[in-house]
Amino acid sequence: MDFYYLPGSAPCRSVLMTAKALGIELNKKLLNLQAGEHLKPEFLKINPQHTIPTLVDGDFALWESRAIMVYLVEKYGKNDSLFPKCPKKRAVINQRLYFDMGTLYKSFADYYYPQIFAKAPADPELYKKMEAAFDFLNTFLEGHQYVAGDSLTVADLALLASVSTFEVAGFDFSKYANVAKWYANAKTVAPGFDENWEGCLEFKKFFN
């Protein structure tokens, strides 16, 4: 399977951790966005939305990290522990995945990306949205070791990729006790966290 990615990208790193958890070897293809490689005709033919991560499994192409994670588990998982078949458990996992995409990671992108890529000043109102997102996550984790149930799922891997990116950006989430406790545990139990952290440090260069 070909996997088009950037190591600094949190969505890409969440897929890499999922593949590691499943014991899948991906043929990693580095895509240089700054050089416009994602806009070349050969890549647009694979993914007309020209985004990363993008997975190519035979004649099937898929993008959007959370969709890729679920696809890999459903097709290649030896069991359903990362994405249980129980409708209620699966619904909670999906909610957490959508929360990551639409609230938590979005708050990161909205606050930090203009500063990184457009040299814009920090917006205190957008900072408050990041704090609100962490408040929600902290509430979700009340009384729970994992973000969606009693064991590690794709929701943990997606949120771990995001939260570790907040860490290298310098966002202090220590005051969110449940998040801090979950993060400390998730780092030790998530397969492939070392590679995830290497990608985080790559991304951190944007802040130097």
Curated annotation (Swiss-Prot):
Residues 86-207 form the GST C-terminal domain. Coiled coil: none annotated. It catalyses: RX + glutathione = an S-substituted glutathione + a halide anion + H(+). Keywords: Transferase. InterPro entries: Glutathione-S-Trfase_C-like, Glutathione-S-Trfase_C_sf, Glutathione_S-Trfase, Glutathione_S-Trfase_N, GST_C, Thioredoxin-like_sf. GO terms for molecular function: glutathione transferase activity. GO terms for biological process: glutathione metabolic process. CDD domains: GST_C_Delta_Epsilon, GST_N_Delta_Epsilon. Conjugation of reduced glutathione to a wide number of exogenous and endogenous hydrophobic electrophiles. Homodimer. This is Glutathione S-transferase 1-1. It comes from Lucilia cuprina. The lineage of its organism: Eukaryota, Metazoa, Ecdysozoa, Arthropoda, Hexapoda.
